[in-house]
Amino acid sequence: MNPALPEDVKNLLTDLETFILDVLKGETLSKKAKEKKEVLIKRLKDIKHSYPQDFQDKAETDDQEENDGFSLPPDAVSIASDRDKDEELPYDGSFYPSVAAQDLDYLRAGYLEKRRKDHSFFASEWQKRWCVLTNSMFYYYGSDKDKQQKGAFSLDGYRAKMNDTLRKDAKKDCCFEILAPDKRVYQFAASSPKEAEEWINVIMNARGNIPSEDEELYDDVNQEMDASHEEDIYEELPEESEKPVTGSETPKATPVPVNNTSGKENTDYANFYRGLWDCNGDHPDELSFKYGDTIYILSKEYNTYGWWVGEMKGTIGLVPKAYIIEMYDI
């Protein structure tokens, strides 16, 4: 029997095998390169046969590590060995049950490149994944036909933003990340900057549109109050009274006097919110605020677009509702 191979040599051979069989699989190779590839594959097989004691348990061990606690059904399209090696338990320690990609009721779905948390020298850093976004969850699969996800996480507490520092190639401006304080960061690359922005918008609206019991109660009880409140605002502007603001127009924040809330801000605790994250307005009619800032909500007219009208320190503007949270538990 041949002596055992050193551990670093075994790791090198494993990385080389991954590079040849996985990384080069989708590449267009010349005839000479294909011949060289076949020679290397044959030599790797010969080495395995010469050192069976070093490779006999490899397949079983890999399956156990890569399954990451999920059981794979017999008819699954995904192969266990193709499972992301960088997957980990969800942040809250819970398991999400297996669900087929085609069984999900989704807000958006499509192929993205997902960045692996850890990758070896030969392994690909970015992997093509079929991503599915529901009202509260983000799933990713090897393909849209998979019977079980490669990973999933709850959107609770997460937000999404562009990040042009993740890559240096042509997709530099197509990258975005989904992140939250003290949680794992998930990074993706779309096919275009526009597609990346669309994913971000859907993610932010999805995580912001998860209604709590208090929010549902508030919407029912205070619907009449909101309508009368808006009438008070526009009665002070006679030149605007004949042309009320519609859902397709941007409300003009600066002409509205600060004292036109008729004293409601002193007792209307349900309309007091605080900043959940820092927010810098991209346009003059958007309100800029920081984490913890107090904001009084004047109107929820643009709720379907993910925006409210708020007032802070005498300034009135549009506020992304996903960036604020109720100040009082009423």
Swiss-Prot record:
Biased composition (Polar residues): 247-261
Main localization of the protein described in the UniProt heading: cytoplasm
Gene Ontology CC terms: cytoplasm; plasma membrane
PH domain residues: 105-208
CDD domains: PH_Skap-hom_Skap2, SH3_SKAP2
UniProt xrefs under InterPro entries: PH-like_dom_sf, PH_domain, SH3-like_dom_sf, SH3_domain, SKAP_fam
Keywords: B-cell activation, Cytoplasm, Phosphoprotein, SH3 domain
Disulfide feature: none
Region spans: Disordered: 53-77, 228-261
Keyword Coiled coil annotated: no
Subcellular location: Cytoplasm
Biological processes annotated in GO: B cell activation
Job of this protein: May be involved in B-cell and macrophage adhesion processes. May play a role in src signaling pathway.
UniProt similarity note: Belongs to the SKAP family.
Name listed for the protein in its UniProt record: Src kinase-associated phosphoprotein 2-A
Organism, as annotated: Xenopus laevis (African clawed frog)
